[in-house]
Amino acid sequence: MIPAVVLLLLLLVEQAAALGEPQLCYILDAILFLYGIVLTLLYCRLKLQVRKAATASEKSDGIYTGLSTRTQETYETLKHEKPPQ
């Protein structure tokens, strides 16, 4: 039932307004094309920044190679003595 109604509406409707003015379509296509280029450039720039940050963090790991863990406990237990009575 629904596909028949849609087909009937498509046959009764006149030419679409967008098809009557191709210059408008060309302008919108150009805007979308430029938008896609800008987004692609921003995405590539972001990927390069992440890659540079990852290599920089790998190089700085050499600072911590000489450190060892502490042998003394951070918190020591207190020896509580009872007062003499």
Swiss-Prot record:
Subunit structure: IgE Fc receptor is a tetramer of an alpha chain, a beta chain, and two disulfide linked gamma chains. Associates with FCGR1A; forms a functional signaling complex. The signaling subunit of immunoglobulin gamma (IgG) Fc receptor complex. As a homodimer or a heterodimer of CD247 and FCER1G, associates with the ligand binding subunit FCGR3A to form a functional receptor complex. Associates with CLEC6A. Interacts with CLEC4E. Interacts (via ITAM domain) with SYK (via SH2 domains); activates SYK, enabling integrin-mediated activation of neutrophils and macrophages.
InterPro entries: CD3_zeta/IgE_Fc_rcpt_gamma, FCER1G, Phos_immunorcpt_sig_ITAM
Keyword Protein biosynthesis among record annotations: no
Topology with respect to the bilayer: Single-pass type I membrane protein
GO biological-process terms attached to the record: antigen processing and presentation of exogenous peptide antigen via MHC class I; antigen processing and presentation of exogenous peptide antigen via MHC class II; cellular response to low-density lipoprotein particle stimulus; defense response to bacterium; Fc receptor mediated stimulatory signaling pathway; Fc-gamma receptor signaling pathway; immunoglobulin mediated immune response; innate immune response
Phosphoprotein found in the keyword field: yes
Annotated transmembrane regions: 24-44
Residue numbers of Phosphothreonine PTMs: 77
Positions carrying Phosphotyrosine: 64, 75
Record topological domains on the Cytoplasmic side: 45-85
Signal peptide: 1-18
SMART domains, per database record: ITAM
Protein name: High affinity immunoglobulin epsilon receptor subunit gamma
Family: Belongs to the CD3Z/FCER1G family.
Origin: domain of life: Eukaryota
Intracellular or extracellular location(s): Cell membrane
Record-linked Pfam families: ITAM, TCR_zetazeta
GO cellular component term of the entry, any: Fc-gamma receptor III complex
Phosphoserine PTM sites in chain numbering: 68
UniProt KW keywords: Cell membrane, Disulfide bond, IgE-binding protein, Immunity, Innate immunity, Membrane, Phosphoprotein, Receptor, Signal, Transmembrane, Transmembrane helix
Function: Adapter protein containing an immunoreceptor tyrosine-based activation motif (ITAM) that transduces activation signals from various immunoreceptors. As a component of the high-affinity immunoglobulin E (IgE) receptor, mediates allergic inflammatory signaling in mast cells. As a constitutive component of interleukin-3 receptor complex, selectively mediates interleukin 4/IL4 production by basophils priming T-cells toward effector T-helper 2 subset. Associates with pattern recognition receptors CLEC4D and CLEC4E to form a functional signaling complex in myeloid cells.
Topological domains, Extracellular: 19-23
Molecular functions (GO terms): IgE binding; IgE receptor activity; IgG binding; protein homodimerization activity
Domain called ITAM: residue spans: 53-81
The organism of origin for this protein: Bos taurus (Bovine)
